[in-house]
């Protein structure tokens, strides 16, 4: 696999009577429910451009950094992308049975610390979040992701 040229920030929520089905519903809501996601760590290529999520053929192998929270109460997730002066991007994923404000704050703090460890300054910070709690089912899920392709 080469260096991805494009990425999209996506999020979704779902609920169901099982934890797995709630997670599946959240992936569907985020537009990536029919993909085989390959988990990545926390680096956004320097020249990657943000774009709208394409329609991947069902079963596509798609690289992504994913934050997922699944539970029987409030669940929240956040992806935070920080762009450094060098152009490199760093990604933090946070998920918890807590408020969206809490996971966003923690994800931003992660990115600030990751920049500090590299001796660089952040020039841009973007977040995508999801938060929900079950209303009509036993389980809820919140997913936030940065998806790569190209």
Swiss-Prot record:
Feature type site, description Cleavage (non-hydrolytic): 41-42
InterPro entries in the cross-refs: Pyr-dep_his/arg-deCO2ase (IPR016104), Pyr-dep_his/arg-deCO2ase_sand (IPR016105), Pyruvoyl-dep_arg_deCO2ase (IPR002724)
Reaction(s) this enzyme catalyzes, per UniProt: L-arginine + H(+) = agmatine + CO2
Leading EC class: lyase
Cofactor or coenzyme needed: pyruvate
A GO term, aspect molecular function: arginine decarboxylase activity
EC number: 4.1.1.19
Modification Pyruvic acid (Ser) occurs at: 42
Keywords: Decarboxylase, Lyase, Pyruvate
Cofactor binding note from Swiss-Prot or TrEMBL: Binds 1 pyruvoyl group covalently per subunit.
GO biological process terms on file: arginine catabolic process
Domain of life: Archaea
Similarity remark: Belongs to the PdaD family.
Protein name from the UniProt record: Pyruvoyl-dependent arginine decarboxylase
Gene: pdaD
């Amino acid at each position: 696999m080469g260096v991805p040229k494009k990425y999209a920030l996506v999020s979704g929520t779902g609920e169901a009577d099982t934890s797995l089905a709630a997670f599946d519903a959240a992936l569907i809501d985020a537009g990536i429910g029919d993909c085989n996601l390959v988990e990545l760590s926390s680096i956004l290529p320097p020249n990657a451009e943000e774009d709208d999520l394409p329609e991947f053929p069902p079963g596509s192998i798609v690289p992504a950094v994913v934050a997922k929270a699944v539970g029987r109460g409030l669940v929240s997730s956040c992806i935070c992308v920080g762009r450094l002066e060098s152009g490199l991007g760093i990604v933090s994923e946070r998920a918890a049975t807590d408020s969206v404000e809490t996971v966003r704050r923690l994800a931003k703090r992660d990115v600030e610390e990751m920049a500090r460890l590299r001796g660089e300054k952040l020039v841009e910070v973007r977040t995508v979040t999801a938060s929900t709690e079950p209303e009509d089912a036993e389980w809820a899920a919140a997913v936030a992701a940065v998806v790569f392709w190209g």
